[in-house]
From Swiss-Prot:
Keywords: ATP-binding, Ligase, Nucleotide-binding, Protein biosynthesis. It comes from the Bacteria. SUPFAM superfamilies: GatB/YqeY motif, Glutamine synthetase/guanido kinase. It holds the Pfam family GatB_N. It comes from Moraxella catarrhalis (Branhamella catarrhalis). SMART domains: GatB_Yqey. This is Aspartyl/glutamyl-tRNA(Asn/Gln) amidotransferase subunit B.
């Protein structure tokens, strides 16, 4: 289901996004310098990265494969004839005075990706966002303002790191759609294994183009919000810029096209410079790099190495396993989590997908988050979690006892069966034993019995709780409910 984004103070919002995603090759796009983050400044740059006279770039073949994977992941036309261009501008962290990019013949052409907006909420909907293009380029260095008092340093470790710049169509009409789009692209590049996409390290950052206009009027003047590297900042920056542009127009002014920065402390955007157009960069073909022709054999090899896409797997989780779109979205938040869930399902059967989803998204994910661990670092393997769920399904233990067993699984290498046996946690299903407990509970809680007989349903829940407490949580809840009603009514 799709839906029309609401107006904001009577204005329609138009948003397009450019994402700069570093590719996770071991060396840079045109040199053999390493790409390890966090090293001492200027220790990972060769003379190629530094722009020494006479040096020649050599293309890293790994970036081609990764870019093709992305193109296939967004259903795009793939550029089999690739050229590189020079984007000319001056900035201290750009040692050559130009950036090598792809202007004329990008490796990824038009495509699309479907996003889920407001996931898990009543107003949840899907929307298709067009991809204009995605092209390869080299990253710039980094200006460092806090290393030396009253001076700015330049760290060129990042210069030459391979990037894929992903340009969307201006198809987003709300803050929520924009954030959902960025999250979906982030999920895809990590799923494909082409980028670590660690936003805090700058390996995945977004430039957001925002404009507003009244319905049935031409699009407004856009402003670009530069270098946003967290989902929270993206949300806040867009919201702030929308409000600013509306205020300018309502006050009788005109929005000036500009590049702006978001100040999170003041929660506002501020002008950085007037926005450049393509001709300001004087693009021309890079004479040092030959065209790259991608063969059918290369395309077939990359396609054969493609994993099942998150969008396809989400659809399978809904249609084949009967999960909600929200559950499918959460479980496919990372390829590792999704694979873990499927491993559990391989053991307990797809008919039990809902209980498996509840345990993976609930107890397991909660414990991982609490301990700041990833799913790959989980002390409980998929096989051991499946063993626990099997014992819930066959009524060996109750759901409440299962949480206790889970805690022991987290702290040890033992199986659920071993823990249940050692701790004496097996569920009590003997009717006679449960009836004996109920007799005592009824005798000691006559007032509660009278309340239930008088029509107070909550009193019955209290009696159930007393029975479960007396059995130390071991009594089968379904049996307790049935026997209680039978014995109270007798």
């Amino acid at each position: 289901m799709t839906q029309q984004a609401p107006l904001i103070d009577g204005y329609e919002v138009v948003i397009g996004i450019e994402i700069h995603c570093q590719l996770n090759t071991d060396s840079k796009i045109f040199s053999n310098a390493p790409t390890v983050f966090g090293q001492e400044p200027n220790t990972q740059a060769t003379i190629v990265d530094l722009g020494f006279p006479g040096v020649l770039p050599v293309l890293n073949a790994g970036v081609i494969e990764r870019a093709l994977k992305f193109g296939m992941g967004v259903n795009a036309k793939l550029g089999t004839y690739n050229t590189f261009d020079r984007k000319n501008y001056f900035y201290p962290d750009l040692p050559k005075g130009y950036q090598i990019t792809q202007m004329a013949n990008p490796i990824v052409g038009e495509g699309y990706i479907d996003i889920l907006v407001n996931a898990g909420q009543k107003d949840e909907y899907t929307k298709r966002i067009g991809i204009t293009r995605a092209h390869l380029e080299e990253d710039a260095g980094k200006s460092v303002h806090d290393a030396v008092p009253q001076m700015t340093g330049v760290d060129l470790n990042r210069a030459g790191t391979p990037l894929i710049e992903i340009v969307s169509e201006p198809d987003m009409r709300s803050v929520d759609e924009a954030v959902a789009y960025v999250k979906t692209i982030h999920e895809l590049v990590t799923w494909l294994g082409i980028s670590d996409a660690i936003m805090a390290e700058g390996s995945f950052r977004a430039d957001i183009n925002v404009s507003v206009h009244k319905p049935n009027t031409p699009f407004g003047t856009r402003c670009e919000l530069k270098n946003l590297n967290s989902f929270r900042f993206i949300h806040r920056a867009i919201k702030s810029e929308i409000e600013r542009q509306i205020d300018v127009i309502e006050d009788g002014g005109k929005v000036v096209q500009a590049t702006r920065l978001y100040d999170p402390e003041r929660d506002e955007t501020r002008a950085m410079r007037t926005k450049e157009e393509a001709n300001d960069y004087r693009y021309f073909p890079d004479p040092d790099l030959l065209p790259v022709i991608i063969s059918d054999e290369t395309l077939a090899k990359v396609r054969a190495d493609m994993p099942e896409l998150p969008s396809v797997r989400k659809e399978r989780f809904v249609n084949e396993f009967g999960l909600t779109a929200y559950d499918a979205n959460v479980l496919n938040g990372s390829r590792e989590l999704s694979d873990y869930f499927l491993q559990v399902l391989d053991i307990i059967g797809k008919n039990n997908a809902k209980i498996a989803a509840n345990w993976v998204m609930g107890e397991l994910s909660g414990s991982l988050n609490k301990n700041e661990l990833t799913i790959d670092q989980s002390p409980i393997s998929a096989k051991r979690l499946a063993g626990l769920i099997v014992r819930i399904l066959d009524d060996t233990i109750s759901g409440k006892i299962a949480k206790e067993v889970f805690g022991h699984l987290w702290e040890s290498d033992k199986s659920a069966d071993e823990i249940i046996t050692e701790k004496g946690l097996k569920q009590e299903t003997d009717t006679g034993a449960i009836e004996a407990i109920i007799v005592d509970v009824l005798a000691n809680n006559q007032a509660m019995v009278d309340e239930y007989k008088g029509g107070k349903e909550k009193a019955f829940n209290g009696l159930v709780g007393q029975v479960m407490k007396a059995s130390r949580g071991k009594a089968n809840p379904a049996q307790v409910n049935a026997l209680l009603k039978q014995m109270i009514g007798a």
